[in-house]
Design a protein with these regions (language model features):
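N-terminal secretory signal peptides that target proteins for export/translocation
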Residues: 1-14
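Bacterial N-terminal signal peptides
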Residues: 18-31
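N-terminal active-site segment of His-dependent metallophosphoesterases
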Residues: 34-96, 228
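His/acidic metal-ligating clusters that form di-metal
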Residues: 38-41, 71-78, 177, 183-184, ...
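Stable alpha-helical elements in mature extracytoplasmic
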Residues: 43, 49, 59-67, 82, ...
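Structural recognition of the beta-strand scaffold that forms the well-ordered cores
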Residues: 46-50, 77-82, 87, 110-115, ...
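Extended active-site neighborhood of metal-dependent phosphoesterases/phosphodiesterases
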Residues: 91, 96-211, 215, 298-331
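Binuclear metal-dependent phosphoesterase catalytic core
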Residues: 289-423
Length: 423
């Protein structure tokens, strides 16, 4: 038989063979469909975000009522306390932190605490007790941010940046995932991200922006690998998105008109990079510098260095007029086109005050000032030092808002609208 020719089958046998092949293909397709059912959409849930609830000791009972009101909300998964468990005029004593920590621990809903500027930045003032801010931040890391003595089966499965050897101090930077949405907690306080304009070296600031940049980069890559539905980044300080420093061609001509350096510059550029890595919706939430009329603000203010709008990043600034009696609720519906719905909730006036917690004895003796944490060595690109994601990437142990356009080219799977506000 010549090369390239085939033996012809009888007409009847050819038809029977074709029918058998079609039947086998259908059976294989049916078996595959039964073996790998489509992924079920996650059910809707919500989370609460609060900030600056306690300013003076008299606010403590109201804070307890606030957390009790939040706990009574149906399908509420967790609470994020975005900074300031104390006021600027309160001394940063150990006993005060212990007292406020007990209020957070009493929450019946899992709670994630992010330090704010009054929690450590303003501790060096006379009203704050004249403490070293870096030492007070380290104290918070060892107490309020420490692991529980006993494992809590109902707690969130949180990954902390301190698990990375190079960033051991940064326990406050955290990441967790809930029903296809990745959440990131970050230490970026007001004002101006604790950038110091006085003479000397900004050691704490310089080291922290490296750690923060690494953590956002890694979270974006994590969300991409897990094919997350969305990503939420939460911190305390207002990054002033309308102020975006760009390289100036003749900056040396401005020597007689100095300006304050933008302490959030690196954070904003890291968010631009994260939006290019993870093309799904990214929600950035932070506390407002002043109370807002509706309790929150939704906009899309992030631009790249070339001025192009980063379309998949939406900002939600929270600023209730009465922080001790109002909280911001974010409803999450991963299966819907509009993933997030933001609303302001009031604590019912008839809600009873929970039992008073034991008062921690006052300690008026400040701790000795600690030396500043030494600078971290220069790091390579974060993609080369990111810790490996375990297996499939799991963690260890109203007014409608228009759809955000893509940052650079179409973003596959980007919903027409991802955030909605309810007045």
């Amino acid at each position: 038989m010549p090369t390239g020719t085939h033996k012809r089958l009888p007409p009847g046998r050819s038809a029977r063979t074709a029918a058998a092949l079609v039947a086998a293909a259908l059976a294989l397709a049916l078996t595959s469909a039964l073996a790998a059912p489509p992924k079920r959409a996650a059910p809707p849930y919500s989370f609460a975000i609060v900030s600056g609830v306690i300013d003076v000791p008299a606010d403590e009972p109201a804070a307890q009522r606030l957390f009790e009101s939040i706990a009574r909300e149906r399908n509420l998964a967790f609470v994020v306390y975005a900074g300031d468990i104390k006021g600027a005029k309160e001394a940063c004593r150990d006993s005060l932190y212990t007292q406020r920590g007990a209020i957070l621990d009493a929450s019946r809903v899992p709670l994630v605490f992010i330090p704010g500027h009054d929690d450590w930045v303003t501790c060096n003032t006379a009203a704050g007790g004249g403490y070293d801010p870096v030492e007070r931040l380290d104290f918070l890391r060892q107490t309020l941010l420490a692991d529980a003595a006993l494992p809590d089966p109902g707690a969130l499965q949180i990954t902390r940046e301190s698990e990375v050897a190079r960033f051991r101090p940064y326990r406050e930077n955290a990441r967790w995932m809930h029903d296809d949405v990745v959440y990131v907690a970050l230490n970026a306080p007001a004002p101006n991200n604790h950038y110091l304009t006085a003479g000397g070296r900004n050691g704490e600031f310089e080291d922290r922006i490296i750690a923060n940049g690494f953590w956002i980069d890694h979270a974006a890559e994590y969300a991409k690998r897990r094919e997350a539905r969305a990503m939420v980044v939460i911190f305390e300080g207002d990054p002033q998105f309308d102020r975006y420093e760009r390289a100036e061609r003749f900056a040396w001509l401005r020597f007689n008109r100095p300006r304050i350096r933008d302490g959030f510059r690196e954070l904003k550029r890291t968010l631009v990079k994260a939006a290019a890595t993870f093309r799904g919706p990214i929600l950035v939430m932070h506390a407002s510098n002043a109370p807002l009329a509706t309790g929150f603000l939704i906009d899309r203010p992030l631009h790249a260095d070339d001025g192009v709008l980063v379309g998949n990043v939406t900002r939600v600034a929270i600023g209730p007029r009465h922080p001790a009696n109002q909280w911001v609720k974010v409803s999450v519906s991963p299966a819907r086109q509009t993933i997030f719905n933001v609303s302001l909730q009031d604590v019912p006036k008839n809600l009873p005050i929970p039992p008073t917690l034991p008062v921690v004895p006052r300690d008026d003796v400040p701790l000795p000032q600690m030396p500043e944490i030494p600078a971290l060595p220069a790091l390579p690109d974060s993609s080369s030092v990111a810790p490996p994601l375990q297996g499939d990437g799991t963690t260890p142990g109203g007014a409608s808002w228009p759809a955000p356009p893509p940052a650079s080219g179409p973003a596959p799977g980007l919903p027409a609208s991802s955030v909605q506000g309810t007045p």
